[in-house]
Amino acid sequence: MEIKSDGTYVDLTLGRAGHSLEILKKLINGRLICFDKDNEAIKESYKKLQKISPNFTLIQNDFRFLKAELEKLGINEVDGILADLGVSSPQIDDPTRGFSYSQEGPLDMRMNQQNSFSAKDIIDNFDESELTKILIKNADVKLANLVAKAIVAKRPIKSTSELVEIIKNALPAKIVREKNPAKAVFQALRIEVNDELGALTAMLADATQLLKKDGKILIITFHSKEDSIVKNFFQKQNYVDPRLNKLPINIQKIWKQKIIFPSEDEKLQNNRSRSAKLRVVKKLSI
């Protein structure tokens, strides 16, 4: 993102302020607004950002409320928006949060710990049909019906490690050998707990309204479900009825989109970046 020293920018996924720190360093008279649902992220990032500049505002809320929160601050347009989607490394690495399928922990997965709805509520209360539906909808889980059936048969389930064993035992050995099936199941549960796909769709609608001409939206995705939402959203924004092409008028697209993949060096340094895609979308000045 090309940062203007007097611009207004939004980091929708603050995390531990990795992106925000770099943006804030380049602002002189500009302003940075940061969102995160996680109170720990807000507290830890504040300590880092205040050492750089006072030109930032932290908002503990879901980025689905982007437009409403900016309106409270008297902001109705911005120069750039960044979103690094999914769960953050500190959340995955903390076993007490329940995001990791490789560590023992509670069935939690809440990004905002002030919310009451957790993964355990889904696992203990959703029927087999509902479980199958979310496993497919959120992560294309292979043989989702078998996983759902096993979860219902074995509940109540107390921990992440117990859930992992149930998932593995429910599926043919060949599938388990190919790839740890718990990864997709945990993704599906996490997305459902935090309504990540619904929030993403709502945020995109707000972001397109707020962005100035020549401004950019940068979105880092990590799986096909969220990436297809971003891609399809901007394709629809640029859609032109083929019948209009026959008219003697010049119809121009509003959005220009490109994709950047991680380099081999980046993949080696950060294994989690292997599945990442950076979509850069520019609002054209027409």
Swiss-Prot record:
UniProt KW keywords: Cytoplasm, Methyltransferase, rRNA processing, S-adenosyl-L-methionine, Transferase
Catalytic activity from the UniProt record: cytidine(1402) in 16S rRNA + S-adenosyl-L-methionine = N(4)-methylcytidine(1402) in 16S rRNA + S-adenosyl-L-homocysteine + H(+)
Enzyme type, top EC level: transferase
A molecular-function term among this protein's GO annotations: rRNA (cytosine-N4-)-methyltransferase activity
Homology family: Belongs to the methyltransferase superfamily. RsmH family.
Binding locations of S-adenosyl-L-methionine: A17, G18, H19, D36, F63, D84, Q91
Biological process according to GO: rRNA base methylation
InterPro entries assigned to the protein according to its UniProt record, in alphabetical order: RsmH (IPR002903), SAM-dep_MeTrfase_MraW_recog (IPR023397), SAM-dependent_MTases_sf (IPR029063)
The protein's name: Ribosomal RNA small subunit methyltransferase H
Organism of provenance: Metamycoplasma arthritidis (strain 158L3-1) (Mycoplasma arthritidis)
GO CC annotations on file: cytoplasm
Lineage, uppermost ranks: Bacteria, Bacillati, Mycoplasmatota, Mycoplasmoidales, Metamycoplasmataceae
Record function comment: Specifically methylates the N4 position of cytidine in position 1402 (C1402) of 16S rRNA.
